[in-house]
């Protein structure tokens, strides 16, 4: 299935010059959303995934149905102050400034095989920070899965050494 036909390109969103890739038109098409999810599930099975991790919010949209299909848990990665129990945290650089991501300290067991999911691989900053959280907890990042990769932004360079699945490239 050609998933690109289900992605809507929105010019000048969220700011002028950006060509936003809207995944909601893929998600609201049942067969396309199922196909995309099934592709990631197949990849995850090959990697013997024990838990799925995803950064908020669109990583949840991808990761939760994958975890469900695999019969494994899902561990959310959230911005600081959003998780109620003890967390590990990582600060990472943005274009202008820094941000912080957190994860419950007991979310990953040492040695557990982890799939990290997100909607989009752009610069790789959020994914690199998520990897750092998983590895702080002793998890083994067995794979990274994205719906979309924006190849011109070079995010793969920050993720060298990790196995990456992308369903579409722009």
Swiss-Prot record:
Chief place where the protein resides: cytoplasm
Enzyme class: transferase
Cellular location(s): Cytoplasm
Pathway annotation: Purine metabolism; AMP biosynthesis via salvage pathway; AMP from adenine: step 1/1
UniProtKB keywords: Cytoplasm, Glycosyltransferase, Purine salvage, Transferase
Keyword Cytoplasm: yes
Cellular component terms per the entry's GO annotation: cytoplasm
EC number(s) reported in the record: 2.4.2.7
UniProt xrefs under InterPro entries: Ade_phspho_trans, PRibTrfase_dom, PRTase-like, UPRTase/APRTase
Catalytic activity: AMP + diphosphate = 5-phospho-alpha-D-ribose 1-diphosphate + adenine
Gene3D superfamilies noted in UniProt: 3.40.50.2020
One function term, GO molecular function aspect: adenine phosphoribosyltransferase activity
Quaternary structure and partners: Homodimer.
PANTHER family: ADENINE PHOSPHORIBOSYLTRANSFERASE
Similarity remark: Belongs to the purine/pyrimidine phosphoribosyltransferase family.
Role played: Catalyzes a salvage reaction resulting in the formation of AMP, that is energically less costly than de novo synthesis.
Protein name in the entry: Adenine phosphoribosyltransferase
Organism: Geobacillus kaustophilus (strain HTA426)
């Amino acid at each position: 299935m050609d998933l690109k036909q289900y992605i809507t390109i929105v010019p000048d969103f969220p700011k002028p010059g950006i060509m936003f890739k809207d995944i909601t038109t893929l998600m609201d098409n049942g067969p396309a959303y199922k196909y995309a999810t099934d592709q990631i599930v197949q990849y995850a099975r090959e990697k013997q995934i024990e838990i799925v991790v995803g950064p908020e919010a669109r990583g949840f949209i991808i990761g939760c149905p994958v975890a469900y299909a695999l019969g494994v848990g899902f561990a959310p990665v959230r911005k600081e102050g959003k998780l109620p129990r003890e967390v590990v945290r990582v600060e990472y650089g943005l274009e202008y400034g820094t941000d912080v991501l957190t994860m419950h300290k007991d979310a990953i067991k040492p040695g557990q095989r982890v799939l990290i999911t997100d909607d989009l691989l752009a610069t790789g900053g959020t994914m690199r920070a998520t990897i750092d959280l998983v590895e702080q907890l002793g998890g083994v990042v067995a794979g990274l899965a994205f719906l979309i990769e924006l190849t011109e932004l070079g995010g793969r360079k920050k993720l060298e050494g990790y196995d990456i699945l992308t369903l579409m490239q722009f």
